[in-house]
Amino acid sequence: KIVAKVTDSINNKKVTKFGLIYGLLKYNGKKTGITSDHLKIGMEGQFVRSYNTTQKGIWKKTDNTTTYVETMTYGANSKEAYTAEYKARAYAVLEDGEIVYSNAIDYSVYEIAEQLYNNCMMPTIDGHKYLYNTILTKVTPEYTEKIYK
């Protein structure tokens, strides 16, 4: 899941659509060759996909900011999916057609799970155990179990 925010206007222009663009950087040890320059509307291809946010993806709305969530799946529950490396960025389409992009981030599900687990950042013990049992030990069977604090 990626959580992003967008304001109702950017550069004094109304935002008409917004969403996320995902790129697959590396899977099964193979680099795909994509860069942040490939993460643009109209550049979708084998390793790049863009998704407009729908009403179901809107998490909360304040006076002038919308927080939205998108969940991406790729080879669910496999070592390959957990260790694949991704790139993502948010975009907003303005009323005049201009598209504004955020900076891109790189991540892997495994790296995020490891960070959350090792720092006991999950809100529940069940979530903590899920990371260990479902992701961390699937990639690294000898992963050391950590007590939830």
Located regions from the model:
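Short, surface-exposed linear motifs at loops/turns and structural transition points
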Residues: 1-149
